[in-house]
């Protein structure tokens, strides 16, 4: 059975759950220009390679690609510009502490619209080793086999 798509997610970072063990999530607002928010509403955003950095006590989103707005004019935005994330000071300090630990990083998990504002769900993740990824795949296959057996058993 296919997974249900998250109805309000405009962009998801599916590779994040495979490459990182996500331990904590925080919602952050995004500072966008007019043409950027129009492109985001059309789901023309890619956060697969994006990451969060902290510059001068501010959280910024790097390597997030938002396609130029098709009906935009010559004042259209730069697709890969650095975007500021809106967080409380306490949350920023919490994320700085988490990213300072060895092997941890802050990555965007999904982008969505909430009450008319663009939001980004950030995850604190620890990078997985190759054997961790293989182990997760084995667990996933075993769970699928058990679910299939239970489903077949209920038919009769």
From Swiss-Prot:
Keywords: Cytoplasm, RNA-binding
Location in the cell: Cytoplasm
GO CC list: cytosol
InterPro entries xrefs: SmpB (IPR023620), SsrA-bd_prot (IPR000037), SsrA-bd_prot_CS (IPR020081)
Transmembrane segments annotated in the record for this chain: none
The keyword Thylakoid is assigned to this record: no
GO molecular function, a single term: RNA binding
Protein origin, superkingdom: Bacteria
Compositionally biased intervals (Basic and acidic residues): 132-156
Major localization listed first in the record, in broad terms: cytoplasm
GO biological process: trans-translation
Region span, Disordered: 127-156
Keyword check for Hydrolase: no
Function per UniProt: Required for rescue of stalled ribosomes mediated by trans-translation. Binds to transfer-messenger RNA (tmRNA), required for stable association of tmRNA with ribosomes. tmRNA and SmpB together mimic tRNA shape, replacing the anticodon stem-loop with SmpB. tmRNA is encoded by the ssrA gene; the 2 termini fold to resemble tRNA(Ala) and it encodes a 'tag peptide', a short internal open reading frame. During trans-translation Ala-aminoacylated tmRNA acts like a tRNA, entering the A-site of stalled ribosomes, displacing the stalled mRNA.
PANTHER family assigned: SSRA-BINDING PROTEIN (PTHR30308:SF2), TMRNA-BINDING COMPONENT OF TRANS-TRANSLATION TAGGING COMPLEX (PTHR30308)
Family: Belongs to the SmpB family.
Listed name of the protein: SsrA-binding protein
Source organism: Exiguobacterium sp. (strain ATCC BAA-1283 / AT1b)
Gene: smpB
């Amino acid at each position: 059975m296919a997974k249900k798509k998250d109805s309000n997610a405009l962009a998801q970072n599916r590779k994040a759950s495979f490459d990182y063990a996500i331990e904590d999530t925080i919602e952050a607002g995004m500072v966008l220009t007019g043409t950027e928010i129009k492109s985001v509403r059309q789901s023309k955003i890619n956060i697969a390679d994006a990451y969060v950095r902290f510059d001068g006590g501010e959280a910024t989103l790097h390597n997030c690609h938002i396609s130029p707005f098709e009906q935009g004019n010559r004042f259209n935005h730069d697709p890969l510009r650095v975007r500021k994330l809106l967080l409380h000071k306490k949350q920023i300090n919490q994320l700085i502490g988490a990213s300072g630990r060895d092997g941890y990083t802050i990555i965007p998990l999904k982008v969505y619209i909430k009450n008319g504002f663009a939001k980004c769900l950030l995850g604190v993740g620890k990078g997985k080793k190759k054997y961790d990824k293989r182990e997760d795949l084995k667990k996933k296959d075993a769970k699928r086999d058990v679910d299939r057996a239970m489903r077949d058993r209920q038919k009769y």
